[in-house]
From Swiss-Prot:
NCBIfam families: lctP, PRK09695.1. This is Glycolate permease GlcA. Residues 1-13, 63-69, 152-158, 221-225, 270-313, 400-408, 460-536 are cytoplasmic. Disruption phenotype: The glcA-lldP double mutant is unable to grow on glycolate and displays undetectable glycolate uptake when grown in the presence of glycolate. The chain crosses the membrane at residues 14-34, 42-62, 70-90, 131-151, 159-179, 200-220, 226-246, 249-269, 314-334, 379-399, 409-429, 439-459, 537-557. It is a multi-pass membrane protein. The lineage of its organism: Bacteria, Pseudomonadati, Pseudomonadota, Gammaproteobacteria, Enterobacterales. Uptake of glycolate across the membrane. Can also transport L-lactate and D-lactate. Seems to be driven by a proton motive force. It comes from Escherichia coli (strain K12). Pfam families: Lactate_perm.
Amino acid sequence: MVTWTQMYMPMGGLGLSALVALIPIIFFFVALAVLRLKGHVAGAITLILSILIAIFAFKMPIDMAFAAAGYGFIYGLWPIAWIIVAAVFLYKLTVASGQFDIIRSSVISITDDQRLQVLLIGFSFGALLEGAAGFGAPVAITGALLVGLGFKPLYAAGLCLIANTAPVAFGALGVPILVAGQVTGIDPFHIGAMAGRQLPFLSVLVPFWLVAMMDGWKGVKETWPAALVAGGSFAVTQFFTSNYIGPELPDITSALVSIVSLALFLKVWRPKNTETAISMGQSAGAMVVNKPSSGGPVPSEYSLGQIIRAWSPFLILTVLVTIWTMKPFKALFAPGGAFYSLVINFQIPHLHQQVLKAAPIVAQPTPMDAVFKFDPLSAGGTAIFIAAIISIFILGVGIKKGIGVFAETLISLKWPILSIGMVLAFAFVTNYSGMSTTLALVLAGTGVMFPFFSPFLGWLGVFLTGSDTSSNALFGSLQSTTAQQINVSDTLLVAANTSGGVTGKMISPQSIAVACAATGMVGRESELFRYTVKHSLIFASVIGIITLLQAYVFTGMLVS
């Protein structure tokens, strides 16, 4: 078997090598933010650039470069695109059945103020979905819900991407934290506890930030009590759950407490002016809210039973994806499990264990696995799809109409699915060629200032892979090693990789493609990217400052 060892300074120096490795990433930013190319076009050109640089600059064998691209593309189709197809299918069923009118009415009965609807649906309910499912489903579902409530697609997608910042680190029952523990050897409980001492600051900030994006300082002054209830209840619960229970449940508990607290609060309080129609403002790119009124929420004309039936697809989804991510269920499909025979593991030819990581990332050359797992029953998307099938019968859609809705879903998602495949192919080429490691080593070389840049490493990882879990797998060990070299807590920097990663989710090409697909913005990925990029950089800087202060000033906040 022919092997190839990654080269991290192929141009002779780390700085120049990093500049070359940056070319595909810079092009992707420019393609979306300046050239305004469609997502699948930008992704395809970026993929071609990354393959050429991998082969000619980083000396990756041609067959391995194309194998990495192929592996990334099929990974984009399964499990990522499958999750999105199932989530959008579920939403479209509620619309086709006419039940979304009841969902809309039930939300308006709590508040008809769109600023508060974003907090309730985008922030709190989205966090619940992130805790249970993760991997794109929360943004797809909450974005579609907000469009159904009357939000313009760009705002629905952008606001949900930014709202999804707070819960990502503990998503899918703590998988990102658990993976960080696996690759570093640090107790996941300690990593989760440390992240739980960083992210609550962001959790409090995000609701205020969302309102400010929609209605400026005026909106914050009018709605600050509700924003404080939503963010404060989430942050406090997030801290206590992560520090005293474990990394698996912070999103579930925080989201439930936030939803209940905000819903109950809105029963006894409402802003002086209720804002019900959002449009883009003329100054500072702010979102200004029109049609002020003080009429308050409109009582629902539907019974409790009708409301529960309308919401049942999302209730079933939450229950099923929670079951799907629990250890006993996963054990059924693990080696030795009762249903392991239903899982197909395919070793990627010309790639599996043929690419070797090298020092300083690892002590000795270590082969990288490349195994595609096709798990038709245990995949998260299947849980959502089963929820959709059950919903066909509960909502009375009918099998024939349900099949038609599914076909319509596939047709509407053809370009987003291609975009997802392309960006994952680019990400995998970047990873297997060593380009991502070269960029990481540049950041790691910042010495005593590295605690500030540490979250940006997680940010970069999530931008490249679309996943906080993958970012931790990619850079977790580098964070730990660098921490020991500069005499800083390794638990702090590994947690910072996770915390910083959440701020990159809103600009990840994968997330952008998912949000556009769910809100009917196919081909408008550049608009959404330009809408979220500055917020991503600001949030990453906030986490960087928090990490720097915890490393050298507020050392009492460290997990001992």
